[in-house]
Amino acid sequence: MPQTFAEKILAKKAGLKKTVPGQIVEITPDVALSHDNTAPIYGIFKRMGGQRVFDPGMHAIFIDHAAPAPTTAHAENHRIIREFVAEQGIEHFFDVGRGICHQVLVEEGLALPGEVVLGSDSHTPHAGVMGAFGAGIGRSEMASIWAVGQLWLRVPESMKIIVQGKLDPGVTSKDLALKIIGDLGADGALYMSVEWHGEAIQHLSLSQRATLPNMMAEMGAKNSFIPPDEKALEFLEGRAQRPFDVILPDPDAHYTQTHTYQAAEVEPMIACPHTVNNVKPLSAVAGTHIDQAFLGTCTNGRLEDLAAAAEVLTGHTVARGTRMIVIPASSQVYRQALQAGYLETFLNAGAVIESPGCGPCMGNHMGVPAVGEVSISTANRNFRGRMGTKESEVYLASPAVVAASAVAGAITHPKDL
């Protein structure tokens, strides 16, 4: 029986010949990811009677959501995490400044083809850029994995997205993701496995590809998968933490839904307040005043994203009365951007550069907006209150558009500067 990626990988992990959508399977993940919520998970783990975690080598723990600590309460949370990591002998621990969990997991060769990554973060599908099954789970579920090493999952139905052709210059995978979310809705892939196929996907760099599975959390997906090709395998040479086996869907597998897009028809898109699926062409909202521009996050804080923004900012300055905040997704990206001269470009333009981490994306620190202010961001969410106050507005866009908007003080296409 032909199998989709999700059906095939979950069958393998459960020791079965095949699975079908809706079937319940018990698996042991290859990677269990947690971040600042490790401290409350530890509390649940202890209440369960847990003493030692199952396989310390399986866990990857990050401090990234509120890092460095903006309050004493956050600092205490970080202390608990560090004590837990030392007590349990966790091998893969990434402290303040190392970067955002999803980005660093890929950089460190911990997100691998044919493996299962379960994380206590809704954007864990990001790992699908490397051909892994990445899925977000709850805190009690993660505590259970710590205790017994297993978790049950319902095999998801699968959606196939085919993107033909090639994106036009100036159009990015962020625009493609927003276009699809706008078309299919915030629940368009609810508890589904979203697979990406077509020549347009193959043309994309790994950095551009990563935005796609990351954004599928905003469509309700359980996981999202891009078939690993030579680009992915070359990236993993000398980087992969262990041997892996690529798992691909069968050519004649059955998909609950199939959607085909022509890449050349995609234009720069904007997600407008207050939902990610409130998507409009850039041309429809051009000229909208902004107070702040934010470049970063696990969605678009990689070197290629910073390069696109730096190109726009060269020879320009951030508009008077507008703030621009730049946060590289990891220390590796920060270092590479420094060497490439991008950070100097940002500084010359009047932007503020912060240490790697999530920053204001979820309203913790490093540039949360004031009441009544408008932000444009490269992040993945713009729910009311996402960046702090519920009395602000957040627009989502690609890195180049965010940079151009910072220069203009209003939502702007780079070509119009």
Give residue ranges: language-model regions.
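Fe-S-dependent hydro-lyases/dehydratases of central metabolism
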Residues: M1-L417
